[in-house]
Amino acid sequence: MQTIQLFIENTRVDLFKDESVTITDTIKNIKDISKVFTTFSQQFSLPASSTNNLIFRHYYNYDIVNGFDARARVNATIKLNGVDFKQGKIKLNNVALKNNKPYAYKIVFYGKAVDLKDIVGEDKLNNLQFIEVKDSGTCTLTSANKLTDFGGSFTTTTSEGDRVHNVDDGTYATVLSVDSNQQLTLNADIFAANDDYRVLLSPIWENDSVEEKLQLQPATAKNTLIVPLITHTKRLYYDSSTNIAGDGNLYWHGGGGTHDHGVAYTDLKFALRVHSIIEAIENTYSDIEFTTDFFNTTNYNYYNLYMWLNRKSGEVSTSTSVNSFQFTVDSWSGGDLNEGGAGLGSTYGITSDFADFGTSFSMSIADSTTAYTIEFFKNQSLVYTTSRTASQGAYTLGTAELGAISTMAGTWHVVISANANVIISNISITLQGIIFDEFGGTSSYTNTITSGNINTPAVATFDIADQMPEIKVIDFINGLFKMFNLIAFVNDEDKIEVRTLDNASSDSYYNLSNVNTYDITEYVDVKESQVDVALPFKEVNFTYEDLKTFLAVNHEQLFNQSWGTEQWNEDSDTLRIDGQSYNVKLPFSHMKYERLINQDNGVDTSIQWGWSVNENQDSYKGKPLLFYPLRNSGTPIQFLVNGGSDQITQYIIPSNSRYLNDTSGEDNINFGPEINEYDRPLTSFSGTLFQNYYYNYITNVFRFNARIIKLTAYLPLRIILNYKLNDYIVVSGKKYRINSIKVNLLTNKSELELITT
């Protein structure tokens, strides 16, 4: 037996003599294919000693103010003979009393990977702090409709369609062209020499920004925001022989006159690179940092994915009325996380609730010469709103308007709406109070967050955060994990290491160069073992949660098969496998796209489009849509512009495949092989999500001779301290993968579930 040591927040706790601590370790369990697991323990007890009472702040006494919060998990480390075994968190379940006195604290230990859900909580994608500023500097030359910066790097930072902000006077313009590293052409004359500027991610919602971003090359790193040819309502088609005013005929008639058909900017919406959402998650939560083993810029199956920003069905909504423009204050700074508040970007956070006693909260808003309405949101829910007339004076809000101190915790943002430009010199938020330390002592603090000068634009802005589809951050992450069969664990550098489980890549978890092999034959208890069927399912179904757009529904009706799905089993005419079905379902929408033909002569065009309507052809919101945007050319399309039209010769089409023909590549985001919507002749692309990311793992356990071997062994400490879940285990000359290990840390008794290879 060895010595077990448990540290909670770096303090060693007292253990009962001979207390048994049993740890279960698994990362991917064949009994629950779609989930990523982590280490956890059975409940065990700690004595109510003076040391432990101090750590848990006498939790049994509920009259203690500012005591231990058992709702949250706290950092912990398990050591064996002084050597680190596992790091993670403990959760206090209850306190056992004997004779009305505390006897034992009952806790459970969890591995570090569980932190992810603890950190992001119930936050949604629109709670994220996106990296809004793409570039900044000072204009060095006055030139009409130009932004010139002799020290600029526009060719690597700025995209056509981006919003440019004159910081000095609060005006905005859209980038029409990136002329060079030092110069941009804009759609408005807003800069003079020595004016400071910012290039921003969230664009102006107008014709110019949409038209420019419809023509970008999505494969270029700086083009994180694009516009695909996906309409929210209008049906697009191509017919060189007809001319119906206002409809979706994309045929280019030469522009102007009566040829007012085609696609308008209001028919379309922006899309954001999925990698930018991952970066926003890291930017929002300081405790989350992913490794680049999977989330990197050269993993194109991932990096080339975009999410369509379809927050609501139908047209984009950016303001409360036609003449009122909204602006989210995006310049918060200051604050101290240790004191409960933090200011950053478009939101400011209050990280914990405070006792009403001894704490005060106030918000001071400077005067403005323009009438406006201001709204205060907590976790995206409106808390308070008020309207101010021009030059009404500065004013202060407090708990009467914003709620009790004890309910302040959350992510806050402020939205200003007005019919004209609003200038407010500062919004100042002050949180004052008393902090109780673990020894009962107190200290006072003052925490101030400021916005600085606010200069709102009188333009409709497509705010990226506000336009994100409605999905929880944790559900989005889990969706990506299911999509690519990913695993995650916290590595020795305290980063969240994300990898594919088992595919052809050398970066795959099962294929890493540091995989070891342990022969445990001599440690196995030969008196007891068990051989189980490897897979308790007759089939595994892979699908998307939302297959309800018009063309996807039509596909199922025509072929009696859901679009892009896979049903894997080993059934045949002479063999019917017994068991239940297991479903791997992504929380995303999956569209079927359409390559247009010229209805006049039946010739294929180079146009492919998506239609976000339901079976009744009504605008459809659906789940978040992921797709590959591809810039294509060949057939010009007609883009409506202020009563006329522009000819666009290259444009972004949506695709489920990374390539438009199988000779270039067949990787796609269907689970099962489907006829590619664009390729001619009609070709089924085999590089599916199942084939690329699940095939090795699933087919191994579906083999007729696949087994799960359950056995007991008394493993030596050198193996217990060093094994990894991708290591091989050898028993009697046969090699196995680890499904799970349960280890009694006191006796070294280990119960192993092993999968045949």
What are these regions (language model features)?
Residues 1-133, 200-336, 424-483, 492-493, ...:
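Polar, S/T/G-rich
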Residues 86-95, 171-178, 734-744:
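Short beta-strand-centered aromatic/proline hotspots
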Residues 94-111, 179-192, 745-757:
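Short, solvent-exposed secondary-structure boundary/capping segments
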Residues 78, 166, 374-378:
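Conserved aromatic beta-strand anchor motif in extracellular beta-sandwich/beta-rich domains
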